[in-house]
């Protein structure tokens, strides 16, 4: 039961890619927000085209808060453990900073279990994955975080927000309990825990838990999808 994102409808947000579909969360695709699809929550994909012009660079924020700790490089990206207060979830494509507010890249994928998850950072052109130290901290604009409760299943009997038009809000939210697999939490390359039943859902082996990406071994676990 993963919170696997799907594509949105044509509506929702600005341009054509923002929110929508039948799902509970926000819109999916290559640059934008959070997943649609039939299930609630969001998919660990890479955004959509739309989403309130979220990719525009407004410069560094007034202040930043802790986002994560460096775990290991992964090809030309880095994998970090999320350490946000109350397990808040970063937006996809949200800028990631050093403590001095120097931007190092943007959030690319989010994966792992609901209360113990990881994210990858697509680095800026002038940054190298090998230049960071183990457990080095990274930071984010607090306005680029969402509460974890937004992605949890609703209690029985609780009504969701009003249903919109094509690609509006709400609909049938929240079925599952994890994030979609990305590039793996531990280990190099695209490995980590994962596979179809993978715990942290990368593109590698492992088993049990929530659904990952394309990975190898492991039992069926709680398979996501519809």
From Swiss-Prot:
Pfam families: Gar1. The keyword Disulfide bond does not apply. It is found in: Nucleus, Nucleolus. Residues 4-51 are annotated as: RGG-box 1. The keyword Ribonucleoprotein applies. Gene3D superfamilies: Probable tRNA pseudouridine synthase domain. Residues 1-30, 150-226 are annotated as: Disordered. One of its GO terms (molecular function) is box H/ACA snoRNA binding. One of its GO terms (cellular component) is box H/ACA snoRNP complex. It comes from the Eukaryota. InterPro entries: Gar1/Naf1_Cbf5-bd_sf, H/ACA_rnp_Gar1/Naf1, Transl_B-barrel_sf. Its main location: nucleus. One of its GO terms (biological process) is rRNA processing. Keywords: Nucleus, Repeat, Ribonucleoprotein, Ribosome biogenesis, RNA-binding, rRNA processing. Residues 163-226 are annotated as: RGG-box 2. SUPFAM superfamilies: Translation proteins. Residues 162-226 have a biased composition (Gly residues). Component of the small nucleolar ribonucleoprotein particle containing H/ACA-type snoRNAs (H/ACA snoRNPs). Component of the telomerase holoenzyme complex. Required for ribosome biogenesis. Part of a complex which catalyzes pseudouridylation of rRNA. This involves the isomerization of uridine such that the ribose is subsequently attached to C5, instead of the normal N1. Pseudouridine ('psi') residues may serve to stabilize the conformation of rRNAs. Belongs to the GAR1 family. PANTHER family: H_ACA RIBONUCLEOPROTEIN COMPLEX SUBUNIT 1 (PTHR23237:SF6), NUCLEOLAR PROTEIN FAMILY A MEMBER 1 SNORNP PROTEIN GAR1 (PTHR23237). This is H/ACA ribonucleoprotein complex subunit 1. It comes from Danio rerio.
